[in-house]
Amino acid sequence: MESVAAGSPSVGASLSSSSSTVLQLLLPMVVLVYVVVQTVVRRRMNTCTAPLPPGPMPWPVVGNLPEMLLSCKPAFRWIHHVMERTGTGIACVKLGGVHVVAITCPNIALLKMQDTNFASRPLTFASETFSRGYMAAIMAPYGDQWRKMRRVLTSEIVCPSRHKWLHDKRADEANNLTRYVYNLAGAGSGGAVVDVRHVARHYCGNVVRRLVFGTRYFGEPQADGGPGPLEVQHVDAAFASLGLVYAFCVSDYLPWLLGLDLDGHQKMIREANEMMTRLPGVLIDDRWRQWKSGEKQGLEDLLDVLITLEDAEAKPVLTIEEVKALSQDITLVAMDNPSNAVEWALAEMVNSPETLKKAGEEIDGVVGRDRLVQESDIPRLNYLKACIREAFRLHPVVPFNVPHVALADATVAGYHIPRGSHVILSRIGLGRNPAVWDDPLCFDPDRHVPADPTADVTLTENDLRFISFSTGRRSCIAASLGTAMSVMLFAGVLLEEAGRDGGRRPQRVEARHFHGKAAGAARRATAAVALLLGYLYVIHRP
C-alpha cells in the first residue's frame, strides 16, 4: 500500500505564499555562482552521450524552483503542466541541484528494467522525522537498515501465515463498521447523513490499531462503535503526516535553507509527528516493559511479534526505537489508500446508478441477505473489485508515487538519468493516459472485468497502467492486507442495499479531479451516505 503522499496542494500553496522571501535570498547567490555552475554543467553534458529528458531550462543553483514558486500552483500541478508542454511521457525539472524526473508512460518501465538502481529514497526533513532517522522501511534509503526492516516485514508481519492469524481482528472491525454506520444512520429522524470520509478513515484507523496494538481505542470505548477524541486526533495526525512527506519543500532541494523554515513546513512536520507518536509511544513503552519483565507471555498482536523477535543467538532483533518506527510505518501505509478509493468509488457510482445496481446484485448473488460480507467472499466479488480498481486509476490517493532515487547514472527510454535523480511516477498521468485508456476521465468499472467469468480480478496492477500498491523492489508488500481492507470497507458500506429498486434516487455528486484534496486538503466534493426508508444512498455534501 505504497501510498505515502508525494506532492501536497496545501503545502504547495504555503510555498507560493513565501516565494518572495525565498527568491530574495536566492537571487544574489545565483549571480555569484552562475559561471562556475555553467562550466560544470557543460563538462557533465560532454561526458554523457544521451540527453536529459525534456524540460524547462534551469537557473544555476536554484534550478526551476523560481518557476515552481511563482506559478501559484501546487507543485504537482506545475510538474504536470510542464509535462503537458513537453508532450512526452517523461520530463525532467531541476529543483535546486536535484533532477526530478516525472513519468506518465507505462512503457517506460524503468522500475522493472533497472529496479535495483532506482531502489533508494530521498533524504528529506519530513522523511527523516517520520521514520525516526530512517530506522524503518518505507522512507529509508537503500542499504543495510532498509534490508533488515524489509526482511522483518516480509517474513514476520505481512507473510500469509500472519495474515491468516490476524483474520479475526479484521473481521471484528468489518462487523463494527456495519454497526457504526447503522448507529449513525439511526441517530437522526427520517434518515441521517453519514460522512463517508469520516467512516472510511476511521475504519482504516481501527483496523491498524487492532492489528498492531490489539485495541480499537487509545481512550475510552465509544458506545456507537465510532472513534473517540484520541482516535480522531491520531487519524487526523496520520493524514496530516501523509500530506507533508515528499511535499516538494524548498529546503529539501536547497539544504542550506534548512532551519529557516520559511514556509512553516518543518513546524507542521514536528507537530504532526508529535501527535502521531505520542499515543502509540505510551502503549509501546508499556508493552516493552511487560515483555522484558516477564509479565507478558503470549503473542496477541503485531506489536508483540516485533518486540519478541530474536536472532539465531536469541538476541532481540529490534530495538524499542525500531519497533516504534516500524509501527508508525505500518500505520501510515495502511490508512489512506483504501479509504480514498472507497470514498471516490461511492461518489462516482452515484453518478452512474447502473454501477450501484450491479454492485448490489453481485453482493446479493455472492453474499445473500442473511449475513455480512466475509473475507472469504472477496475472490467472487469481482465487480466490487473492478469498481475499486477504477477508483485507484481515476482518483489516486496522491499525484505521484514515493520518489525513487537513482543510485548510479542510467539511460531510460534514450534519456540520461543522472545519479541522485528523483524519479517519480505520476499516478494521475498513468491512470489517465489517453494512449492507454479509452475515455480516461470516465468512471467505467467494466474496463477491469475480464471476458472470462472465472478469472479473478485483483487490485494490483503490475503493468503500471495505473498504481494501486506499486511495483518493484520498493513496492508495497502488503497488497493482501490492502485488498482485504479496501473490499471489506466498500462491501460493508454497500451492503445496506445501495441504490436498489424501490428506494429514492440518490442525488448527483460532482467528482472533481484533484480540485482540492490530492494529498491532504479537503476542497473537493465529499461523499456522504444517507439511510432513508431502509436503503443506503450516497449524496453530495458541500
What residue ranges belong to the model's regions?
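Cytochrome P450 heme-thiolate monooxygenase catalytic core
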Residues: P122-F130, K164-V342, K358, E375
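Cytochrome P450 catalytic-core helices
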Residues: N337-T355, G360-E362, S480-E496
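Conserved cytochrome P450 K-helix/beta-meander segment immediately N-terminal to the heme-binding cysteine loop
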Residues: L425-V457
